[in-house]
Amino acid sequence: MANVIVVGAQWGDEGKGKITDLLSVSADVVVRYQGGINAGHTVCVGEQTFKLHLIPSGILYPETCCVIASGTVVDPKVLLEEIRHLEELGISTKNLFIAETAHVTMPYHRLIDIAEEERRGKNRIGTTGRGIGPTYADKSGRTGFRVLDLMQPEGFREKLEWIVPLKNVLLERLYNLPPLAVDQVAEQYLAYAEQLRPYVIDASLLIDQAVRTHRNILFEGAQGTLLDLDHGTYPYVTSSNPVAGGACVGAGVGPTIIDRVIGVAKAYTTRVGEGPFPTELRDEVGRHLGERGAEFGTTTGRPRRCGWFDAVIGRYAVRINGLDCLAITKLDVLDELESIKVCVAYHCPSKTVEEFPSDANLFGRCEPVYETLPGWKEPTGHCRTLEELPPKARDYLEFLAHQMKTPIALVSVGANREQTIIVEDPIHGPKRGLLGHNGD
């Protein structure tokens, strides 16, 4: 048995969907433990491309149980659209379950999210405008709705009658927006509730039963370490905890059941939205990475900012998550480059540092210290073993493993499921050096 967490080691969009899909073949249960529809996972199987937002990537395996856990926030309208879309493609959702204690994104959450971002002006954060932050804010403020509230029509309407007027004060007086009608919200959400009812369960109990019966459980995070509310580049972060520790809280399990933590990182770095990004490239190389890597957000369609691999934030992700091994994705995007840079430290205003600074203002003034490696100038998309990779591509991976002080278990060389090099079984293999890294 192995219970594994898959976590993003950068600013999200690392390719966790593909890695989770790949690992789901040996998982009995896949659990999405935090976030909402602000995340997007793209999985390519043969000629089909699946873009998922809230439903775990394991849904593509008919016998795998998929859980949307308590730590997530659920937009009923979008979730139902996602379910319908999968079923139209012939993908069954009979093994999909939604935690009754997950919080619900309401219409006013979206309105407030968009209006507040506009009000911030030049201080905007870069939110997706999907209402995620306001939903988590109401959760913390104890004024939120949970999925189980939707299942109780009388109590739901009663709560709406005192919450909606409060939100209308904000909408009308602060944001100059029209008020919401209680009747309209109630009718809309109670209709959603009836459609979602067959999926709603006590998710923590289901997960506990899976643990007790020695099932393989895969915990799937959204976003990435540097977007974590507590450990990311605050305030340019999400409103939940994508780090490995968030899996235990979001899923309702104890840390002692976790066997492995796998970090996913691109062979370069991307970021969506605002915030410091030391290795960002605003030149032809940056444009090449964006075009070759199809760097557009699955959820928003916004172009991602692109830059060189940052080993400083990588080491930070290793430390914060306790990573056992890494999956490096999109190596093939670098195939045509003459030379490739890796950030190994930062020049801060007064000194050179090799560790990530917590202060976003200081981080914004850091300049990258690079080491330059030769490119390999040949395609890698056909490679299925390390030996088939160009020697300089292997050298690059060795360098990343050494800088991160963490072994690499998987290498992705294309979007499709089969375009993956399995260096060593990331779930059942021994925790030892891969690609020559020995922990020194």
UniProtKB/Swiss-Prot annotation:
<feature type="binding site">
    <location>
        <begin position="330"/>
        <end position="332"/>
    </location>
    <ligand>
        <name>GTP</name>
    </ligand>
</feature>
<keyword id="KW-0436">Ligase</keyword>
<dbReference type="InterPro" id="IPR033128">
    <property type="entry name" value="Adenylosuccin_syn_Lys_AS"/>
</dbReference>
<keyword id="KW-0658">Purine biosynthesis</keyword>
<dbReference type="GO" id="GO:0005737">
    <property type="term" value="C:cytoplasm"/>
</dbReference>
<keyword id="KW-0460">Magnesium</keyword>
<dbReference type="GO" id="GO:0000287">
    <property type="term" value="F:magnesium ion binding"/>
</dbReference>
<dbReference type="InterPro" id="IPR001114">
    <property type="entry name" value="Adenylosuccinate_synthetase"/>
</dbReference>
<dbReference type="GO" id="GO:0044208">
    <property type="term" value="P:'de novo' AMP biosynthetic process"/>
</dbReference>
<protein>
    <recommendedName>
        <fullName>Adenylosuccinate synthetase</fullName>
        <ecNumber>6.3.4.4</ecNumber>
    </recommendedName>
</protein>
<comment type="similarity">
    <text>Belongs to the adenylosuccinate synthetase family.</text>
</comment>
<feature type="binding site" description="in other chain">
    <location>
        <position position="223"/>
    </location>
    <ligand>
        <name>IMP</name>
    </ligand>
</feature>
<feature type="binding site">
    <location>
        <position position="40"/>
    </location>
    <ligand>
        <name>Mg(2+)</name>
    </ligand>
</feature>
<feature type="active site" description="Proton acceptor">
    <location>
        <position position="13"/>
    </location>
</feature>
<dbReference type="GO" id="GO:0004019">
    <property type="term" value="F:adenylosuccinate synthase activity"/>
</dbReference>
<dbReference type="InterPro" id="IPR027417">
    <property type="entry name" value="P-loop_NTPase"/>
</dbReference>
<dbReference type="InterPro" id="IPR042111">
    <property type="entry name" value="Adenylosuccinate_synth_dom3"/>
</dbReference>
<dbReference type="InterPro" id="IPR018220">
    <property type="entry name" value="Adenylosuccin_syn_GTP-bd"/>
</dbReference>
<feature type="active site" description="Proton donor">
    <location>
        <position position="41"/>
    </location>
</feature>
<comment type="subunit">
    <text>Homodimer.</text>
</comment>
<keyword id="KW-0479">Metal-binding</keyword>
<comment type="function">
    <text>Plays an important role in the de novo pathway of purine nucleotide biosynthesis. Catalyzes the first committed step in the biosynthesis of AMP from IMP.</text>
</comment>
<dbReference type="InterPro" id="IPR042110">
    <property type="entry name" value="Adenylosuccinate_synth_dom2"/>
</dbReference>
<keyword id="KW-0547">Nucleotide-binding</keyword>
<feature type="binding site">
    <location>
        <position position="13"/>
    </location>
    <ligand>
        <name>Mg(2+)</name>
    </ligand>
</feature>
<dbReference type="GO" id="GO:0005525">
    <property type="term" value="F:GTP binding"/>
</dbReference>
<feature type="binding site" description="in other chain">
    <location>
        <position position="128"/>
    </location>
    <ligand>
        <name>IMP</name>
    </ligand>
</feature>
<dbReference type="InterPro" id="IPR042109">
    <property type="entry name" value="Adenylosuccinate_synth_dom1"/>
</dbReference>
<keyword id="KW-0342">GTP-binding</keyword>
<feature type="binding site" description="in other chain">
    <location>
        <position position="238"/>
    </location>
    <ligand>
        <name>IMP</name>
    </ligand>
</feature>
<dbReference type="GO" id="GO:0046040">
    <property type="term" value="P:IMP metabolic process"/>
</dbReference>
<feature type="binding site">
    <location>
        <begin position="40"/>
        <end position="42"/>
    </location>
    <ligand>
        <name>GTP</name>
    </ligand>
</feature>
<feature type="binding site" description="in other chain">
    <location>
        <begin position="38"/>
        <end position="41"/>
    </location>
    <ligand>
        <name>IMP</name>
    </ligand>
</feature>
<feature type="binding site">
    <location>
        <position position="142"/>
    </location>
    <ligand>
        <name>IMP</name>
    </ligand>
</feature>
<feature type="binding site">
    <location>
        <begin position="12"/>
        <end position="18"/>
    </location>
    <ligand>
        <name>GTP</name>
    </ligand>
</feature>
<comment type="pathway">
    <text>Purine metabolism; AMP biosynthesis via de novo pathway; AMP from IMP: step 1/2.</text>
</comment>
<feature type="binding site" description="in other chain">
    <location>
        <position position="302"/>
    </location>
    <ligand>
        <name>IMP</name>
    </ligand>
</feature>
<feature type="binding site">
    <location>
        <begin position="412"/>
        <end position="414"/>
    </location>
    <ligand>
        <name>GTP</name>
    </ligand>
</feature>
<dbReference type="Pfam" id="PF00709">
    <property type="entry name" value="Adenylsucc_synt"/>
</dbReference>
<feature type="binding site" description="in other chain">
    <location>
        <begin position="13"/>
        <end position="16"/>
    </location>
    <ligand>
        <name>IMP</name>
    </ligand>
</feature>
<keyword id="KW-0963">Cytoplasm</keyword>
<feature type="binding site">
    <location>
        <begin position="298"/>
        <end position="304"/>
    </location>
    <ligand>
        <name>substrate</name>
    </ligand>
</feature>
